[in-house]
Amino acid sequence: MRKAIIAGNWKMNKTVDEAVKVVEELKPLVKDATCDVVVCPTFVCLDAVKKATAGSNIKVAAQNMHFEESGAFTGEVAPGMLEAMGIEYVVLGHSERREYFNETDEAINKKVKAAFAHNITPIVCCGETLEQRESGVTNNFIACQIKVDIAGLTKEQAEKVVIAYEPIWAIGTGKTATKEQANETILAIRNVVVEMYGKEVADKVRIQYGGSVKPNTITEQMAMSDIDGALVGGASLKAEDFSGIVNY
């Protein structure tokens, strides 16, 4: 059985004080959670949030990182810096990074490998546009992403990857894929992992759904065969809302 993982991507929200306040409110609400609980604050909040989660069951993720160890990359953060802070996860290849910062699958693959080199678990995002969904090319498009994003890993690394399926048309729009659509696409993603690394590895890979996840939609999504969690956006900014999802 794969253990569910629910992560809250705060995006570019929350000052340090606000971030710590949310975590302090969240801790008692999710202390009995049966899934892995992860929060993804901005870089400036990582240290304070990491300290605030000490002794709790809440893990901390960065929202991005560079693939190089150090150097003249102004504004970037190296994987070793995150490792030194005790950061457990990193979100890579989010559609907003791909769209606004022109991130390529090749760069994402370098980041995935760098994350593993520094004992950080990557949460690798993939997903299609509405145009691609309506044209019937969703599975082909996502397969192309995944085949590059997680290429060249050992089987031990591959089985630890978390994949987040986020239909771009459902992010922040209030629209959400039906539980059947989400499960069908996630099953297709798992089959790509089977092709790449074999069934034994694919059966261990946790695949989340993301895209306007709310407390009132999570239960039916988590009941599906291949959905192993959620990457939550706006609904993770309030402790009460996020705990309602975590405690599905």
From Swiss-Prot:
One of its GO terms (biological process) is glycolytic process. The active site is at residues 94, 166. InterPro entries: Aldolase_TIM, TIM_sf, TrioseP_Isoase_bac/euk, Triosephosphate_isomerase, Triosephosphate_isomerase_AS. Substrate binds at residues 9-11, 172, 212, 233-234. Homodimer. Belongs to the triosephosphate isomerase family. This is Triosephosphate isomerase. It comes from Clostridium botulinum (strain Eklund 17B / Type B). The lineage of its organism: Bacteria, Bacillati, Bacillota, Clostridia, Eubacteriales.
